[in-house]
From Swiss-Prot:
HAMAP family: DNApol_clamp_arch. Gene3D superfamilies: 3.70.10.10. Keywords: DNA replication, DNA-binding. Sliding clamp subunit that acts as a moving platform for DNA processing. Responsible for tethering the catalytic subunit of DNA polymerase and other proteins to DNA during high-speed replication. This is DNA polymerase sliding clamp. Belongs to the PCNA family. Homotrimer. The subunits circularize to form a toroid; DNA passes through its center. Replication factor C (RFC) is required to load the toroid on the DNA. GO terms for biological process: leading strand elongation; regulation of DNA replication. One of its GO terms (molecular function) is DNA binding.
Length: 246
């Protein structure tokens, strides 16, 4: 038996994040809450979300179950709701029923065995910066019409994001005093595909800050919390493979 009640805003943000890399996802529901891990078909980006039961206004799960869903179908349900509403979710055999005020809609579940849950790689780095989401977004937006990649540089002095083409270039500089925290004793550099980052930053609009971690030509790790619910937060992890440059 699964019965949940969650704000439409939280559900939309979860769905928007997943839709940046996958069209189908498998959720694990147990006594602690709900979690999902997904990787895009090209194995370039991965997302991990942990939704503690405290995020839900109602939460009941008898044991551990897996729920596999088409993300577009989930988004079609969310479009029926007002952003200030809550949505009730109940598993009924092979369907998931959504109650939104005086509207109810059932969506067929997918076979969970057809969706592989990826293993999260151990790519921890001791180098990181905690950056305001709004500052990070400005750096990405400055680069989006210049190149399809962006280069990050982290040092003891701060964080830089640069992009260039034959005719244009952009640079965002965040000195140490503009960062919430910084841990870096060296100068490290790595480039990443901009398309994935632009989709990601748009989907995490409620996050206040991002913990960005990487090494030279190494996968990028971004840890964040979604802040729609002041009493409990959704914990997220975004991983992105580097773009190797000549």
């Amino acid at each position: 038996m699964i019965r949940m009640n969650i704000s439409v805003r939280n559900l939309k943000e979860i769905t928007d994040l997943l839709s940046t890399i996958v069209s189908e996802a498998k959720f694990k529901v147990d006594e602690n809450g709900m979690s999902v891990t997904a990787v895009d078909p090209a194995h370039v980006a991965m997302i991990r979300l942990e939704v503690p039961k405290e995020v839900f206004s109602e939460f009941r799960s008898d044991g551990t179950e897996e729920i596999a869903l088409d993300i577009d179908r989930l988004k079609s349900v969310i479009r029926l709701a007002n952003s200030s509403e809550n949505v009730g979710i109940t598993k009924d055999k092979e369907k998931l029923k959504f109650d939104l005020g005086n509207i109810s809609k059932s969506v067929s579940l997918l076979d969970p065995s057809t969706i592989v849950t990826p293993k999260i790689p151990n790519i921890a780095s001791e180098y990181y910066a905690i950056i305001k989401r709004s500052d990070f977004e400005r750096g990405l937006r400055a680069a989006e019409d210049i190149s399809d990649s962006i280069r990050f540089v982290l040092s003891s002095e701060g964080f830089r994001a640069t992009s260039h083409s034959e005719s244009e270039e952009s640079e965002m500089v965040l000195p140490k005093d503009m960062l919430s925290d910084l841990s870096c004793s060296d100068t490290i550099k790595s480039s990443y595909p901009l398309e994935y980052l632009l989709k990601f930053i748009k989907a995490v609009s409620s996050a206040d800050s991002l913990k960005i971690s990487f090494r030279d030509d190494y996968p990028l790790s971004i840890e964040f919390y979604l802040d729609q619910n002041p009493s409990a937060k959704i914990k997220g992890l975004f991983l992105l493979a580097p773009r190797m440059e000549q």
